Amino acid sequence: MTKFASSFAAVAVILSLTGIAAQAQEGPWLVRVRAVNLDSANKDSTGLGLSVNNRTIPEVDISYFVTPNIAAELILTYPQKHKIYSGSTEIGSLKHLPPTLSLQYHFSPTATFRPYVGAGLNYTNFSAVNFVPAVQTALEPTIKYNSVGLSLQVGADIQVSKNLYVNLDVKKVQIGTTVYSKGAEAGKFKVDPLLVGLGLGMRF
């Protein structure tokens, strides 16, 4: 009985070490490529009924796992162009570049289905802001070109092979600006988009 117990304990230790080794072989880096639908909240206090169009954009994120459960994620894309509307009338366009850095908690880091939550900071730079000549002449509009806000996130990675994952990700991001007319503040415009993304990830 003692020999059996000792043998069982030895097998248990070996299996445990094998599991740890298998987990250790999974690299700390995870790179995802996603198609993201950007749905703007369009909260406007200028009285002009400002809004920007919704669109689908490409996105790349790079995650580094500090522990099996905790990761830092940096989200990148190139400057995205949006049309600016007043009511239903197009009055201009702009580009925005919105890198976001988040800290994530992954609930089941060794399972096939790996849900996570995250929170972080978004920095958005607005550029190439243009208005149609009639609006430019009448209002001389300008905007604040930088925005800093919070980001909340929920998502899941689904393992489909050793290093390949399907990813579903949902974020709510605070993005806004101050609108000026002839040098005076006219109000605030908040994009505050809901971002729903689907893509693939590679772990290494």
State the predicted function of each range.
Residues 26-27, 37, 61-134, 193-204:
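Gram-negative (and chloroplast) outer-membrane scaffold detector with strong preference
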Residues 33-61:
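N-terminal targeting signals for Sec/Tat export/insertion, comprising classic cleavable signal peptides
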Residues 42-52, 80-96, 123-146, 175-191:
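Flexible, solvent-exposed loop segments that connect beta-strands
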Residues 1-27:
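Cleavable N-terminal export/targeting peptides
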